[in-house]
Amino acid sequence: MKLMKLLKLNINNNNNNKLLLKNLLLLMNKNRLMNKLSNNNKYLSELNNKGNSLQHLNNMNNWKLQNYNYNKNNTINNYINSKLINKLLYKLMSLKNNKIIISKPLYKINMNVINIRFYYYNMNNYNYNNNIYYINMINKLMNRLNINMNNLSNILSYYYNKKVIIEPIKLKYLYNNNEIMTKYISLLDNNKYNNGLLMEYQRTLNNIMPKLNDHNISMNYINNINNINKLKYNNILLNNNNNINNIYNNININNNMNLLMFKYLIGWSIMLKGRLNKNISRISTTYLNNGTFNNKKYLWGNLNNNFKLNYINSNNNIYNYNNINKNGKYNIKVKLNYI
């Protein structure tokens, strides 16, 4: 009986200590906020500056492997296995049709399930004569990946001792994934564009890229950020005399947040560097810029200086690709800017 009472007392003391620590942290945070609220303009400008970086609002991470980490050796094995499976998927997807480009697969490894997701794009999307063949071919591939009894997911399940799910996602447009877009550009015939490379690439890209309404979209995005900051500021003012726990619970910004998650492409930049032309022996560099990466100051000067639209890490997707053609080695760097 005495032991039971002692255990209960210890549990109660631990709970009380946790509550006390939580309240102390909240009080310290409240004092910090109240000190800043003494100068309203200063605090609002600080919120706006944080909104410009957008990291606290749009935390979309570019990850390739999410691993349930319970064993370091197992983590290393999962990484090595993912490399082997990547090669297998590349071979499998190009077995029937070499016009299919796939991105690097994403692995999400949990206790009981492994989810493998990758994006693919068919370069014959605009060739309507191949539609029936393409549909039949994709059906066969899906059977091999997930549906048939002897499919790849079942084989990998035996290997991992847990369920494996493969999710191939078809992309309608190249610019939905920077890796696929970079691979597509690398497959274009550079020798065909020896004279007038810049013009030919621009013509090709204009056919596959959206007609950007980037300026208006960016202004709406910035206005939404400012509205969110005002909501946060007003919420703190309204709750500063109430229970401190309510400061973080009474704000609702879901309506604005729905507009912020990688829905719009507002700029793209492509750099081609290397031996791209038979007639020029030296290494040349070519830049193609559009949208927020456009160098026209009268369009983007003020916005880029104030809001750093091209330097938001969570919104920028960058991919490099090296290749060799008949003229020599060259590099392609693609930057896509989403909001």
Swiss-Prot record:
Swiss-Prot/TrEMBL keywords: Mitochondrion, Ribonucleoprotein, Ribosomal protein
Cellular component GO terms, alphabetical: mitochondrial small ribosomal subunit
MF terms (GO), sorted A to Z: structural constituent of ribosome
GO BP of this protein: mitochondrial translation
InterPro entries for this protein: Ribosomal_uS3m_fun (IPR007980)
Biological function: Essential for mitochondrial protein synthesis and required for the maturation of small ribosomal subunits.
Name of the molecule in the record: Small ribosomal subunit protein uS3m
Organism: Candida glabrata (strain ATCC 2001 / BCRC 20586 / JCM 3761 / NBRC 0622 / NRRL Y-65 / CBS 138) (Yeast)
Record gene name: VAR1
